[in-house]
């Protein structure tokens, strides 16, 4: 991929900031920064304790973009990700309460520990750059990037990632 001079400078600056926090992951840092510039998403798979979460958090801090972390456990629900509507008695109307995806960078930590329904909600937001809650469409902020981590298969509590039909086409 060819970078403009401006993008090269930005990548060098961000790489320098991230390398203050995490060492020995130069290639991973470059790949994540490339995904950031391309407004793509990243899936990092490795064994526990090697710095996956630290790397994603360092990127969030270095960019200054809005950042949220979601720890994907079996009890996380799709509405935690997308948001939900709630009745406001004082105003006598329903209001949208934003979910974790309403951020620029979402760290989806250990996504293979949550249910396929919750994974599906995240995948839809990643692909569509929007969520639909109770028939109302809510656009995600620009840029919207997901850095997802997963532990290698075989670790206790992990399950296969949901694969959509679109991925098979």
Give residue ranges: language-model regions.
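AAA+/SF3 P-loop NTPase mechanochemical coupling elements
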Residues: 95-104, 133-150
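Conserved small/polar residues in nucleotide/adenosyl-binding loops
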Residues: 162-169
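Conserved AAA+/SF3 P-loop NTPase catalytic/coupling segment centered on the Walker-B
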Residues: 103-126, 158-160
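Short glycine-rich substrate-engagement loop in P-loop NTPases that contacts/grips substrate
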Residues: 79-100
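Walker A/P-loop
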Residues: 38-72
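Pre-Walker A (pre-P-loop) alpha-helix and adjacent loop at the N terminus of AAA/AAA+ ATPase modules
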Residues: 8-41
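Conserved catalytic/switch belt of AAA+ P-loop NTPases
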Residues: 120-139
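AAA+/P-loop NTPase substrate/partner-engagement loops
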Residues: 66-86
């Amino acid at each position: 991929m060819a970078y403009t001079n401006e993008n090269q400078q930005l990548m060098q600056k961000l790489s320098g900031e991230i390398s203050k926090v995490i060492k020995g992951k130069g290639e991973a840092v470059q790949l994540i920064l490339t995904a950031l510039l391309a407004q793509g998403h990243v899936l990092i798979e490795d064994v526990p304790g090697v710095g996956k979460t630290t790397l994603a958090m360092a990127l969030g801090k270095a960019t200054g973009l809005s950042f949220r972390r979601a720890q994907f456990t079996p009890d996380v629900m799709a509405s935690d990700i997308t948001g939900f509507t709630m009745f406001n008695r004082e105003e006598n109307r329903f209001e949208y309460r934003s979910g974790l995806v309403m951020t620029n960078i979402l760290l989806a930590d250990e996504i293979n520990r949550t249910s396929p329904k919750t994974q599906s909600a995240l995948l839809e937001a990643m692909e569509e750059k929007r969520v639909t809650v109770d028939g109302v469409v809510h656009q995600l902020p620009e840029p919207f990037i997901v850095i997802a981590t997963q532990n290698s298969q075989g670790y206790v509590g992990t399950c296969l990632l949901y694969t959509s039909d679109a991925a098979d086409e």
